[in-house]
Amino acid sequence: MNILNELNEACNYIENNIENEIDIKEIARITNQSTDSINRFFVSMLGITIKEYIRKRRLSLAVYDLQNSDEKITDIAFKYGFNSYDSFCKAFLNQHHVTPTQAKNPSCEVNIFPPATFEINVNGAQKIKFKICDLKEFEVYGISKNFNCQS
């Protein structure tokens, strides 16, 4: 199994267990990676840790529940693993920039974080227009990252 399949397996596991306690060690076991490795892959591919990904997904699904059910905010908070109403409201406000009560309104703007999928897209065979010219000396700065797509 290559790393993209493993990351997709991790995301599927998270989605299927989003209302339960999610153990990062179990995700590591499923993906045949260490907890540090799986976390590094999430950070390098999504820019957030796996715990942040889980929190963002839970808070996104909470919006759906707020707008489409009669569940109390407290019940939704506990459903998605928050220990208190206050911690849920604080995290909700941090992600969505509105309170859970305001988010009950379907016209309210929120920041939904969709489920992640990992794939490789290869585009090519396009005609490239170019021009060769002499330039003055200049410096180039950048950041390089190497990814091993094989386990």
Where are each of the predicted segments found?
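Terminal helix-turn-helix DNA-binding modules in bacterial transcription factors
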Residues: 8, 12-16, 21-25, 44-80, ...
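Short, well-ordered alpha-helical segments
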Residues: 143-151
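Nucleotide 5′-phosphate-binding alpha/beta core
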Residues: 32, 41, 48
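…primarily DNA-binding HTH/wHTH and HhH modules…
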Residues: 1-5, 9-12, 90-138
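Short coil turns linking two alpha-helices in DNA-binding domains
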Residues: 31-35, 83-85
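Short hydrophobic/aromatic patch on the recognition helix
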Residues: 38, 42, 87-88, 92
